[in-house]
Amino acid sequence: MDPQDCTCAAGDSCSCAGSCKCKNCRCRSCRKSCCSCCPAGCNNCAKGCVCKEPASSKCSCCH
């Protein structure tokens, strides 16, 4: 299981799996599955992208 909170610095690797469930994950190794909270209806995020920031009109996995 992934830790609930990654403490690694931005760009560093960490123990997160590809499904990254960390609240504050900034690691390059697992950022691909983490994104800002997406607007309602973002299909990409609904497919497993972990919400890690307050909701916004844009996110890293749906443009």
Curated annotation (Swiss-Prot):
A divalent metal cation 3 binds at residues 16, 20, 25, 30. A divalent metal cation 1 binds at residues 6, 8, 22, 25. InterPro entries: Metalthion_dom_sf, Metalthion_dom_sf_vert, Metalthion_vert, Metalthion_vert_metal_BS. It comes from Gallus gallus. A divalent metal cation 4 binds at residues 34-35, 45, 49. Metallothioneins have a high content of cysteine residues that bind various heavy metals. Gene3D superfamilies: Metallothionein Isoform II. GO terms for molecular function: metal ion binding; zinc ion binding. GO terms for biological process: cellular response to cadmium ion; cellular response to copper ion; cellular response to zinc ion; detoxification of copper ion; intracellular zinc ion homeostasis; response to interleukin-1; response to lipopolysaccharide. Keywords: Metal-binding, Metal-thiolate cluster, Zinc. Residues 1-30 are annotated as: Beta. Class I metallothioneins contain 2 metal-binding domains: four divalent ions are chelated within cluster A of the alpha domain and are coordinated via cysteinyl thiolate bridges to 11 cysteine ligands. Cluster B, the corresponding region within the beta domain, can ligate three divalent ions to 9 cysteines. A divalent metal cation 7 binds at residues 51, 59, 61-62. A divalent metal cation 2 binds at residues 8, 14, 16, 27. This is Metallothionein. A divalent metal cation 6 binds at residues 38, 42, 45, 62. A divalent metal cation 5 binds at residues 35, 37-38, 51. It comes from the Eukaryota. One of its GO terms (cellular component) is cytoplasm. It holds the Pfam family Metallothio.
